[in-house]
Amino acid sequence: MLPCFTRKPVDHPLGFLVALSGLLMQLMSYGIDNSYSIFSDDMHKDPSLGYPSVTTISLGNSVSLGLSPAFGVLCGFLVDRVPPRLMMAVSTLMLFAGLWLSSTFAHNVTAVTFSYCLLASISSACMLSPGAAATSSWFNRYQGLAMGINFSGGGVGSAIIPSLAGKWVVAYGWRKTFRLMSAFCAIGVVATLLSARRAPPKKEEAGPSEYDEGQERQEQGEEEQAHTDEENRNNNNSNGETTPARRGLHTHKLNPWELFLTMFSRAFLGNFFCWLIFSWAFYSLIYVAVPYVSSMGKAGTVYADISPIPTDIASTLFTFYGVFQIVGSILVGWLATGTTNEFAYVLCATIGGIFCAFLGFCRSYVAFALLLCVIGFCMAGMFAVMPALIAERLYGPNLGFYMGAVFLAGVVGGFSAPPIQAELQQRHYGNYTYVCVFMSACMTLAAAVCYITMWRDKRVRIVSAAAEAKLA
């Protein structure tokens, strides 16, 4: 976008076009990345790869999904200093190159991991923080809704690309399917052209009503942080220390040491652990969904007596999952705008945890579809609210870094969940019940962490501020 278009007041409608660019980037990236487990069986039977084991193939999924947050920290640091569209262009190019390199030159699963999965991981990192940071710069009042639109792209991609990939891999094999999927990278080109960070308007050009409303919203957030900031200063001053990093968090670009110090604040740690615990459930579901459903009727498993569900049919469940991710992202974003981000997150995590437990009892296609609709809705809502939670507490010129640093927690779940879950179900004769219980526990614990570290603390600050205002 040209500077004359980006120099707009807070909450300007043009910001929704930037949110749309984030949606398109996530459609491309997550739609392709989430399809990887669909190729597991075809790669396992491929003589050109040496018939690799399922666990070995799952390591590629770990690299693709798990290392992305690690690269995201660097990308978050860079997006505070370079235009978001540059990062998005790199993301599109890396994903396109990975699909073609692996499908053309890979002759073992290790080559697939390094030629596709590693590049896909970097690609995902280059689009997530830039898209979220660019969108958040346009909004205060409607930030929850805008983030919901931005993060609904994963649902759109999951509804479209995996179902197509499931049909293509049966008809053409994984190599040609990779090349066909590369056509979706054209979406990334369009998204790159639409993305831009908002530039503050000149005072004489800014409409007083819209601009002042955005400023009032930001000042309210600053007041909510005042109580916590004062406690941190008092604690540090009692030890003979000063807190320049904490004082300048929202107003100055911090140096690496100051950024490191702020990572021990309650605002950062609360967001970090919410994402850390949730990532276990999310990446477990992405990896096991299709293998779990397609194991129905498979000999040698506890589901041998169940009516079989072929892989190409099982992959279509991502359509239901993806559609309800779209609905969940937008509706939960709207709910967060009308209530609080913390309430929306806790509600989605609690309901999602309950239905993850029920997933272990499913045996039919219809039952899987119904539960994945609810789980997709809840997980998408958590995805949409998470950046808003980060922006609400860590807003300012360092927001891109904090986005990437919080998403770094996903390394734990993304990198370790797929091989652990693959090994877990194999040790129990293909029984996925343990995986479902684990996902349920993680979702529930994420809700508890959000309530303890953010929602309850926010309510206490608001009540205290209201009491002080009443006494004054």
From Swiss-Prot:
Assigned keywords, A-Z: Cell membrane, Glycoprotein, Membrane, Transmembrane, Transmembrane helix, Transport
Glycosylation sites: N108, N431
Renumbered residue ranges of the record's region Disordered: 200-248
GO MF annotations in UniProt: riboflavin transmembrane transporter activity
Record topological domains on the Cytoplasmic side: 1-11, 80-85, 130-144, 197-271, 337-341, 387-399, 456-472
Compositional bias ranges of the Basic and acidic residues kind: 214-233
Topology of the protein relative to the lipid bilayer: Multi-pass membrane protein
One annotated GO biological process: riboflavin transport
Main function: Transporter involved in riboflavin (vitamin B2) uptake. Also transports FMN and FAD.
Name of this protein: Riboflavin transporter RibJ
Organism of derivation: Trypanosoma cruzi (strain CL Brener)
